[in-house]
Amino acid sequence: MKLTKIKTVLGTPYFETESVVIYNMDCKEGIRTIKDCGLKIDCTITSPPYNIGKEYEDKMHLVEYRKWLASIVNGIYDITTDYGSFLLNVGYLEIPHRGKAVPITYLLWEHINFYLNQEIVWNYGAGVACKKLLSPRNEKILWYVKNANAYTFNLDEIRDPDVKYPFQKKNGKLRCNTLGKNPSDVWQIAKVTSGENRASAERTDHPAQFPIDLIDRVVKGFSNPDDLILDPFIGSGTTAVCCINNGRKCIGFEISTDYCEIIRERLNQTKN
């Protein structure tokens, strides 16, 4: 029903399945249209361009970038349900004469309406080796909520079943949660690798691909079955794959036609 409404206002998608619609368009236009039609999103998961001049992005002036990103985040706020979450994967920016690794969080702090509920550290393990710095091995996932006192969070869905730490009850007895350990706010999940003889099985031609294990945890932990999930920079389509695998609906915006083709090929191989 929700996807039918989306198609009514946005038109024919670039690609669709029973539970996913992908639009080849600027996400700002898409978010504005969703707001105008009164549709609400249960959870948004995304990783916008970091503005560090990578091959797939145009570098902006810092203030311009902050305004651009804040306008998108506030647009997402306007279309989020009262119990909804926004999971934002961010990296670091270099500010000339001030800092080499400044968290994007600091730039957004006073300019967005969401409540920052928690910062998740994604420790991806392998990466670039540095000689004059500590080698970077993590990125952040900022967990924003609309209502600080009431939000969707399914801890039991994302517990680590292989680790069961005992805890003490009021009567002094020790017991373990049979579903496993709380995964904590540090997630050890390997990144998608590339290169001859070392490329991940899920690797596509997208240069900044989310690993399925990462987004799978986000989808299960911060949304409910049949919820509507948005990824405004859907890139390689990992969010859509995880929505299909976990019984969620997904809207994805991607401005690159080449990446939309990657998504089409990938979703054609994914069971719906």
List the predicted regions and their residue ranges.
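Core catalytic lobe of class I
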Residues: 2-3, 7-261
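Cysteine-dependent PTP/DSP-like catalytic domain, specifically the C-terminal lobe
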Residues: 258-272
